[in-house]
């Protein structure tokens, strides 16, 4: 419940910043792509209430990586406000509703990819870099292709949000998520390698870290 309350509180604050950036609710409903974006946001929020992710330190945690959460928080608040604001004032925007629709599609696809692993892992999915009780290495399904699908979904989701508001600032903000995500992945994989030893090494040898075929 604590995790759900935090998600809800952050969601409310982010929604408020987006509305503030757009100058009210009316401008959002004047653009069909943004109306579709609002529907997708609502669907993803509802879906998140059925997840079992947590913020537990579990049996062992790398507390030195908690700074990444603070960076994510600041970046996400900027993502909530700046793309909407630059869209409203026409600063560094990309012309055309087609880019908005592309953004909506990417936002939805990224959101699904972000949330899918949370459902797969259940209570083993933590917002912290930690080993949970009964932790097991999942190597099938989407994890048989890439080791960090949720983070790839996070990047795609954030990029889609920026494009839905035609915002180049939003695109840059999405790119700024990559360094802390890579730092987070390295910390997580170091812990998994310590926990599962040769099993994780064999798994990492046959899969990509984040982007199939590239990285």
Task: Give the label of every model feature segment.
Residues 155-157:
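PRPP/pyrophosphate-binding module of the type I phosphoribosyltransferase fold
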Residues 1-132, 160-215:
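Membrane-anchoring alpha-helices and their flanking helix-loop junctions
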Residues 128-153:
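Active-site-proximal inter-transmembrane loops
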């Amino acid at each position: 419940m604590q995790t759900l309350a935090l998600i809800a509180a952050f969601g409310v604050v982010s929604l408020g910043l987006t509305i503030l950036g757009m100058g009210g609710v009316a401008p959002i409903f004047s653009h069909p792509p943004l109306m579709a974006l609002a529907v997708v946001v609502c669907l993803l929020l509802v879906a998140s209430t059925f997840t079992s992710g947590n913020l537990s330190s579990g049996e062992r945690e790398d507390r030195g990586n908690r700074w990444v959460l603070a960076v994510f928080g600041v970046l996400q608040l900027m993502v909530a406000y700046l793309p909407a604001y630059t869209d409203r004032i026409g600063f560094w925007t990309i012309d055309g509703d087609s880019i908005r629709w592309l953004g909506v599609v990417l936002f939805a696809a990224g959101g699904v990819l972000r949330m899918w692993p949370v459902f797969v892992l259940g209570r083993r999915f933590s917002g912290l870099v930690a080993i949970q009780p009964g932790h097991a290495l999942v190597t099938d399904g989407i994890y048989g292709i890439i080791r960090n699908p949720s983070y790839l979904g996070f990047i795609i989701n954030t990029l889609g949000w920026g494009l839905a508001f035609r915002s180049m600032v939003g695109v840059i903000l999405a790119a700024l998520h990559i360094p802390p995500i890579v730092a987070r992945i390295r910390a997580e994989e170091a812990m998994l390698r310590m926990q599962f030893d040769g099993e994780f090494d064999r798994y990492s040898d046959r899969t990509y870290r984040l982007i199939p075929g590239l990285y």
